[in-house]
């Protein structure tokens, strides 16, 4: 099985105040973490629907304190969600607040699944992973997917000045190394994923919310605050 990225406790100190810290950084957008999480998951659901795909099992890789798991369960209408994270404190909080028969959480060190999931969702994780460990991490995700399974890779877009500003205001992003869309494409292709589509979202802050209906026609312009690469695990 591919090697998991090294366990790090750095995020443990942010677990209790993670959303407060991130919301402070997001203040310039006029929105909070829930707005962006909901937008990501709904966009993923829309993309899967266009592909006539209905995943039964979903892995939330780098789930943090687990707040996206209920959104994935509801919007993707899947049967189960498993969240994994390298932060033991975050997983403890997720299990205490959100675990249910359909939603479970594990520390990354305890995660050993192979060929088990129909879809993997991963948001804003790779800019925290050292360059030398990124391909191993993608291979780990690939091995967790069933052949033909879908990987929804979300990252902050370094080509967006607003994104760079928000990250500069976020305490736990101070050591982040951003992942460009072109770099992500190369990494995913090297790991054996077939790219299905790339979309760019979150162009307008709340102050320009009246322009947000335009975002659905801007998704191929590489300037949105975040991007999603939707790809498929090849059969071999």
Question: How should each PLM-predicted stretch be described?
Answer:
Residues 135-147:
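A short glycine-rich, Lys/Arg-flanked "PGG" loop and its adjoining helix->strand segment in the class I
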Residues 157-174:
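Short, glycine-/aromatic-enriched active-site segment of Class I SAM-dependent methyltransferases
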Residues 177-192, 198:
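Short alpha-helix
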Residues 36-54:
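Conserved alpha-helix/loop element of class I SAM-dependent methyltransferases that forms part
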Residues 121:
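A conserved beta-strand element that flanks and buttresses the S-adenosyl-L-methionine
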Residues 1-25:
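N-terminal, positively charged/glycine-rich alpha-helical extensions of SAM-dependent methyltransferases
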Residues 67-110:
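Class I SAM-dependent methyltransferase SAM/SAH-binding core
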Residues 148-155:
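Conserved beta-strand signature within the Rossmann-like core of class I S-adenosyl-L-methionine
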């Amino acid at each position: 099985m591919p090697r998991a990225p090294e366990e790090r406790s750095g995020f443990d100190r942010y677990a209790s105040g993670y959303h407060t810290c991130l919301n402070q950084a997001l203040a310039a957008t006029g929105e909070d973490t829930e707005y962006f999480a909901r937008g990501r998951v709904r966009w993923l659901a829309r993309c899967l629907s266009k592909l006539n795909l209905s995943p039964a099992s979903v892995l939330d890789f780098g789930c943090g304190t687990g707040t996206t798991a209920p959104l994935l369960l509801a919007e993707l209408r899947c049967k189960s969600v498993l969240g994994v994270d390298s932060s033991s404190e975050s997983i403890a909080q997720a299990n205490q607040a959100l675990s249910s028969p359909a939603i479970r959480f594990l520390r990354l060190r305890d995660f050993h699944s192979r060929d088990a999931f129909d879809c993997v969702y991963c948001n804003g994780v790779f800019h925290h992973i050292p360059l030398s460990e990124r391909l191993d991490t993608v291979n780990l995700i690939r091995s967790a997917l069933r052949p033909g399974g879908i990987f929804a890779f979300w990252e902050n877009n370094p080509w967006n000045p607003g994104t760079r500003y928000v990250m500069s205001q976020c305490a736990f992003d101070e050591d982040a190394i951003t992942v460009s869309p072109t770099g992500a494409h190369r990494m995913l292709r090297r790991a054996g994923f077939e790219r299905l589509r790339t979309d760019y979202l979150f162009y307008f802050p709340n102050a320009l919310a009246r322009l947000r209906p335009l975002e659905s026609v801007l998704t191929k312009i590489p300037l949105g605050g975040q991007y999603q690469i939707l790809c498929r695990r090849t059969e071999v």
